[in-house]
């Protein structure tokens, strides 16, 4: 037990204290605490340390065979004793991250109403739009500093899950704490229940959300704005992370609010930041620069285009012109390569097209330019998948890429595992062990010709906890593109492969708290440099990061009046 910090004064006692997850210690309450807080007789006689509690919890966890059962078990601990939950997860982060987040959280979102046990966070439904202020005041957390909000329309690669999407904000905020040290007392998951267009949810008698098709257009925009304005009044300094909004809303919401409040979209900006960081590490390992690469994307939605824009910004920072950088990026969607004369291009796609005059010089069978056509003609050195469609990185595509690139960089990033564009084993086999691979979901190391290849998980959890920690540490007022770029560079500096010439592209999850601290420092420094946070010395920034880094230790309690 960590008694270094001053005691907490608690206004609860008896069963109410045991039913408060942020404060409950279970069998770790001391003799004095049991007496002062009316807990005598409510707990077994033994007084245990958090280490003993964690060992028991892990033994129970190991008895479950199915990942979903493990997820439900961990969520139950989280809703009972949050300190124990985070100690358990931190002790087994590599094993448990896939359980509390991707890929298992996807299935948990699909089955949310059926596995529901206890409310967590806020469910803000459209029929109650006139009472958003009251709902925020009802939150169990009063000093909220980080909000993750979704409307449940684009959950991972699984589509519209309605309020089932709440599993994502809950999981993301668990990682803010486990990876980034942000106190769970400062976090709030929110789902905006605007209905669902998923017929399975609407017809499911167990579905707990608003049983209505989704609102859209001005009604939707007004509802989201009412929520944002209410948050600004209740918690004016809170960081808001937009999560898993559909393509048609994700970019417009980000553009509308990024210069008005402290916010970012993790699917667009967080994914871009971790991908750029991984690419910088891969380029260093391949003894090249990002500005020298030719990059092909499969998937030209808001996430793919967000990554592309971040890559272009980094390439320009390395000394090439923006026009040159854009000419080296090839966006492929379901209709083929994006070309400037194509109809119905989305606003955020228009700056990422190739010129028809350029494509006319290619050797093509017809005007529909496929990914394989891009491989044969543009000869990309980097291939990034954000399509959500499994198997599209075929053997022909990967072998064609390897034919002109000795060390191809291949990132099949779609989540969950069932949606990945190609498995790492196939990519490594098809390139005879030469590909540099990172994936969006966790994969076991690949053995090829007697050599073991660890697979980096290019997961946003390497980025967003550190961004949040840096913002909180220096009270940054905005999240800028430059702050995100700083996070990418800091992540790249942690790459074992880039540093040592062997190992994975990204550091092991066991080091993720160190990585988050490094990213937090880089983000905080950039925020100060840009005038988005009060001035602080480097030493003071580090002190503030330490002061904000929550530890999963029990505090001593003192009784206050109640």
UniProtKB/Swiss-Prot annotation:
Residue positions binding NAD(+): 154, 267, 415
Name this protein carries in UniProt: NAD-dependent malic enzyme 1
SMART domains with a match to the protein in the record: malic, Malic_M
Site (Important for activity) residue list: 267
Residue pairs linked by disulfide bridges in the UniProt entry: none
GO MF: malate dehydrogenase (decarboxylating) (NAD+) activity; metal ion binding; NAD binding; oxaloacetate decarboxylase activity
Active site as annotated: 101, 172
InterPro entries listed in its UniProt record: Aminoacid_DH-like_N_sf, Malic_enzyme_CS, Malic_N_dom, Malic_N_dom_sf, Malic_NAD-bd, Malic_OxRdtase, NAD(P)-bd_dom_sf, NAD_malic_enz_proteobac
EC number, as in UniProt: 1.1.1.38
A Gene Ontology term for the protein's cellular component: cytosol
Subunit structure: Homotetramer.
Source taxon at top rank: Bacteria
Annotated catalysed reactions: (S)-malate + NAD(+) = pyruvate + CO2 + NADH; oxaloacetate + H(+) = pyruvate + CO2
PROSITE patterns: MALIC_ENZYMES
NCBIfam families to which the protein is assigned, alphabetical: PRK13529.1
Group of enzyme by EC: oxidoreductase
Pfam families attached to this UniProt entry: malic, Malic_M
């Amino acid at each position: 037990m960590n008694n270094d910090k001053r005691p907490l004064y608690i206004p609860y006692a008896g069963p109410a204290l045991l039913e408060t997850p942020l404060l409950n210690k279970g069998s770790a309450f001391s003799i004095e605490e049991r007496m002062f807080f009316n807990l005598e007789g409510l707990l077994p006689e033994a007084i245990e340390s958090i280490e003993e509690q964690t060992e028991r919890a892990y033994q129970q966890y190991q008895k479950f065979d199915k990942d979903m059962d493990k997820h439900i078990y961990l969520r139950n601990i989280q809703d009972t004793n949050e300190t124990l939950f985070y100690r358990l997860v931190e002790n087994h982060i590599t094993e448990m991250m896939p359980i509390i987040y991707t890929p298992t959280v996807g299935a948990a979102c699909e089955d949310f109403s059926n596995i529901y046990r206890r409310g967590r966070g806020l469910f803000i439904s459209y029929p109650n739009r006139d009472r958003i202020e009251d709902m925020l005041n009802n939150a169990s957390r009063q000093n909220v500093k980080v909000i993750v909000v979704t409307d449940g329309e684009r959950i991972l690669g699984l589509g519209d899950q309605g309020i089932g999407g709440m599993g994502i904000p809950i999981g993301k905020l668990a990682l803010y704490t486990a990876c980034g040290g942000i106190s769970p007392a400062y976090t709030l998951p929110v789902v905006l229940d605007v209905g669902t267009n998923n017929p399975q949810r609407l017809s499911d008698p167990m579905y707990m959300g608003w049983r209505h098709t989704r609102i859209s257009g001005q009604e939707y925009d007004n509802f989201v704005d009412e929520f944002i304005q209410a948050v600004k009044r209740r918690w004016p300094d809170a960081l808001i992370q937009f999560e898993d909004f559909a393509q048609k809303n994700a970019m417009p919401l980000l553009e509308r609010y990024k210069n008005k409040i402290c916010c970012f979209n993790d699917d667009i900006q967080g994914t871009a930041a971790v991908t750029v960081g991984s690419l910088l590490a891969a380029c260093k390992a391949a003894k090249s620069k990002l500005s020298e690469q030719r990059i092909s994307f499969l998937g030209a939605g808001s996430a793919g285009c967000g990554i592309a824009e971040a890559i272009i910004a980094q390439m320009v920072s390395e000394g090439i012109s923006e026009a040159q950088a854009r000419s080296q990026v090839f966006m492929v969607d379901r209709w083929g390569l994006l070309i400037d004369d194509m109809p119905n291009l989305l606003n955020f796609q228009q700056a990422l097209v190739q010129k028809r005059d350029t494509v006319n010089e290619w050797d093509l069978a017809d005007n529909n330019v496929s990914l394989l056509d891009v491989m044969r003609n543009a000869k990309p050195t980097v291939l990034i998948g954000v399509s959500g469609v499994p198997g599209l990185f075929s053997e022909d595509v990967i072998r064609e890429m390897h034919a002109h690139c000795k060390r191809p960089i291949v990132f099949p990033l779609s989540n969950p595992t069932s949606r990945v564009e190609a498995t790492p084993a196939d990519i490594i086999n098809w390139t005879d062990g030469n590909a540099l691979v990172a994936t969006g979901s966790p994969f076991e190391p690949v053995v090829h010709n007697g050599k073991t290849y660890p697979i980096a998980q290019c997961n946003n959890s390497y980025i967003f906890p550190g961004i949040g920690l840096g913002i909180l540490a220096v009270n940054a007022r905005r999240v800028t593109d430059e702050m995100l770029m700083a996070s990418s560079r800091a992540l790249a500096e942690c790459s074992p492969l880039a540093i040592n010439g062997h190992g994975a592209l990204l550091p092991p999850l066991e080091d993720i708290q160190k990585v988050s601290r490094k990213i937090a420092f880089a983000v905080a420094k950039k925020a100060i440099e840009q005038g988005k946070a009060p001035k602080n010395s480097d030493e003071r920034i580090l002190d503030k990061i330490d002061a904000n880094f929550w530890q999963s230790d029990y505090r001593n309690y003192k009784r206050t009046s109640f």
